[in-house]
């Protein structure tokens, strides 16, 4: 595959529905070209023009050959491709083996945490009873009933090994591949059991669970997993859906293992797999079944009936060991104790409860808290009851409570008033403050704890005081109880006791109950290592989790079922462990439950003992028909072509998946709505599909149960979708949830790839001049203003044209010994009527200039003259309104017209020859200004040795003469040998006065001694000649201005000539490499495009951001970024430039001796340069150069202003150069016309939003017309959309504000530092817009207090960051750069600043002045002195790495590459970055974005290189770059910018 640098393959998987045609075309151009074309290595070969010499003094000079980097780049690309491919092929299970053991537990993934615990290592040592059950399981479907800790999993491992061996034999015999499925009931068990199997089976073991996005996988993905793996560990619902969708068939499974098999009942996925798929397959196609449980029942009731029913459910037979004594040797039962506590008081209202009930008792969202606190007063005591309020009303819980208030009010049948919502929200906040300010007493005071908790405290104190080796688990029924007990025992500070909490994962929790699978694992790891030795846990710790041996298990809340008793008792695995049960004294219910459970255990034991010897039940078979009869009346539908099956249960999941697929360009996931109503004493459910669905839903059939009505309606809806072909044969949606196709794509184009393009040599205006009737002439008065006195007078001249020329800016030329001289040009306001005679005279005067000064004789053709030159009177700028006729020195014109030359005669006064311009009629190299008469020399004297060397040096007459041999002899025989010798200054052949002299030009001798007779004395005044010697440079620059303006006219842009030319000027082959040594630098071209390109790039980003934001209010930030990337990418700009032939106008060559002459005249005498024009008319340009010029044009348009708004012309330029329907804007004010106010913005704002806007206005000075915009700017994505202010999160506004902030910062730097290059500007802009600074600014502005978020970790991060940044500020002694030393802030803080900017911009109707006002007031004070941030960018890891490799080690053969790793659809993107040095991958890193992956890879590379001496570096990486270093070496590495 070709190099995929930050590129994702979208050729087959991306849905382009709804894309505009230009974006689709761009997608094809970028992603679907020939493979070779997509490889930068193949595309980077330099294209050079063999005739592109720019040194006009040496027409045969050849360019120095450029180094060919394609081979090196090709190797680097291949190495990175191999690395990318390797990482792609390594699936999640192989990645499991690469645990970064050096990291702390807090940094490890769940998989690595499990692996680090080394679960199951060395466990394969089966006991006799295990072998006995294994042998049974080999021959028949079996449910193994063994105590917790007795090694049921080992039996499964033995069975898996046996099955795999048979499978390998079957495959060798050509049979169909089959795999084994190990089904578990929780995500944590999926990790744990997969780890155990991997340590004991030498085949590929995969583990899957729903959060991995498995519901979005298609059949091809599952086929790949089935092909790759021998065993798949997964949660049961995954396999159930796969079987129903026919991704996996029952005949593809050789073994089904059910962990904790007692769950197989009712509608559990275990039962549905058996009922809907297993029993529907032919018996010969069914796999072996093996179930594992500590007790076959988990409910009350008839034990035997429940056990036999389980056997029927799983088509298996219960078996247990006959060697009970052997089992007891392995599993030692703990000592059971009963801890009785005094009777509890009835629930009562504590002081805090009374206070809360009096003030806030009618707030419905607090009902659950009231209920728990009421019961806790009895169960746990006053202190614990009160602390429940502290948890329930913590700061991080408030946003969710406020959201729940909205839900409750809006669920009422009456229309909710905003005031009611606001009132309850205010009261919730008041309640939180009340709890915060409440004084909590010491829990050790009498009466604060219940008798139950006091007994627990007493027993724990005794156990932990007696020994430091105690490890304890305390089981509670409620999660709140576990949480508060953990807090209590932390406060009590019992010696040696280190409490922790382990509760289940449950989405949608409030009150600080949120916990993740990762946090569960961390708690278990800490318990294993002893960091925690007293774990307060709910039922999550009872079942299956491999909790390390502990010697004390306490049932704080009494168990309710036999399985709870067996499972929790099984946690006490130490040989001297204690299992304590807490019961209330004189509580008949507790005593009855103890007795009931003991009897149930005895019944269960007897049940197992009466099993026949062969462990097969006889006479107790449960009727299979009665088992399946439950499903009668519940319809099913099977797609014959695929075998996919639709059931009542699967219909709900299928509709959810279908709704998710409709997420096209929205932030929130579309959901199916079920509305259940009662009609005719039955339940009826209406299914409402998301609005993007072509089918909007239906109303189902009546049913007697609400759940059945819902499933029935979902089933019918699926049938309707299938009928309309909206679901395929596997019940997958025909739509695909669209992740933007261009995510992480590299839409840039290589600046190394060049092609030959046409280049305009002359502006078209000169050709038009020849066809324009000669009636009125327009003049431009041109004069020279030197920075210091020149050696010779330079008289103004007038340039006359048939068409009026624009006003040209002043520019510099270099006269004499590099005296900088401004060329001033003033267009005359009035046209000039010239008679035929006068025009003839002007034509003669102009042609005389070309003949005498430049050795070109043109035919006298008035109609072909593009322009005329005339001597002019001196005027200032105010004199441009003077009558043009009065500006021309007609006397001089007439004199030149009447005198072809000043004739030399023998009686001519020698002094009359001084201060004349004399030229050699036969050799254009010799032009002279006479200085004085050399009285001491005669024509026959040899020339002084200081004169420039010529062929004939025997005497001055011969020295002066240019004739050939025969003509020379005739002349010498007749000339006057007594004429005066003149001291003269030889005019240098230098034409490029736009630049200073070269060293060679400076060294040229100009003092000469000549005779006048061999030469011709020009009738042109020397002052005019002096000025006209600069005319080639002047007219070349004017031509460039005119060509640039011609391009602007083509684009319908009005741009100042100096900015226009700057935008089109490329003065070297690598102009874009701002600080690299310039290759083939073109002298005298003035400013190049790089600064304007930097400015234009920033405006382009802002303009397209505004356009996309305005036209697509429902897009999310992700789509905004992608669509903007499509608009502003170099590829798009390049394509537009090619279409509009912008390349023709680019000035890539400096002054040329060949093309400045007037075009169209007939040359009679002199060297014909027309043969050179063909080669001069082509230039080699890189694709990136052409794209950069487009951005520079936008920058030039910005500086040129506009008719109404200063952004008008730049806005128009963006439309012209982006050339997309997404940006059809001709002026700034049109943006607001594109914007349709979204509903949330115009909704009536609530009191809370008004209050927010008022406070922010007081602090920041901006008054919001739409306060809900501000509410959106502070709403974090973690806050559910129905909570808080019920506005979109800040991501859209942040996208807009980011570009606005960039623009205002760049404009400020561009204006303040006119001489700084783009690299410097970029590095210092980085400081101004960095997350580091914006995070500190966010705290300064108080945004951290206003964020609406729902995330415990985020709140903690913000708190810690605020503490650190405020400390840094306090210790900075007033320094404005205090923020530089702080750690990186949580990203939400800088995001809120940018979102605020977006909000005020939208609220002000797109008034950029509000952004500038914010910048001047809040940001600029930090950056008045930019020198203090000179090293900021250099601290960026990527920049630092680049500098270290280049400057310290002198290495150029390295690169930093990034590419996206393929993921399943719907999963977060993962980008791999790697640093490659001389073919060695020295570091790699992964992240969700290319930027952060490169940063991390750079940091790792710096760590590798730390302390390495240059000599050691060269030896280690075989670096010889210093020996072969070339000035044009180019390194491919990301920068800090």
Curated annotation (Swiss-Prot):
Residue span, RNase III domain: 1043-1202, 1253-1405
Annotated Dicer dsRNA-binding fold domain residues: 651-741
Chain sites annotated for binding ATP: 146-153
Source organism (scientific name): Aspergillus fumigatus (strain ATCC MYA-4609 / CBS 101355 / FGSC A1100 / Af293)
SUPFAM superfamilies: P-loop containing nucleoside triphosphate hydrolases, RNase III domain-like
EC number(s) reported in the record: 3.1.26.-, 3.6.4.-
Every Helicase C-terminal domain range: 459-618
Annotated ranges, domain Helicase ATP-binding: 133-314
Protein name: Dicer-like protein 1
Every DRBM domain range: 1439-1507
InterPro entries noted in UniProt: Dicer_dimer_sf, Dicer_dimerisation_dom, DSRM_2, Helicase/UvrB_N, Helicase_ATP-bd, Helicase_C-like, P-loop_NTPase, PAZ_dom
Its job: Dicer-like endonuclease involved in cleaving double-stranded RNA in the RNA interference (RNAi) pathway. Produces 21 to 25 bp dsRNAs (siRNAs) which target the selective destruction of homologous RNAs leading to sequence-specific suppression of gene expression, called post-transcriptional gene silencing (PTGS). Part of a broad host defense response against viral infection and transposons.
GO process terms (BP): defense response to virus; regulation of defense response to virus; siRNA processing
Transmembrane segments: none
Region (Disordered): 38-68
Keywords, in A-Z order: Antiviral defense, Antiviral protein, ATP-binding, Helicase, Hydrolase, Magnesium, Manganese, Metal-binding, Nucleotide-binding, Repeat, RNA-binding, Zinc
Cofactor(s) needed: Mg(2+); Mn(2+)
UniProt-annotated site: Important for activity, residues: 1387
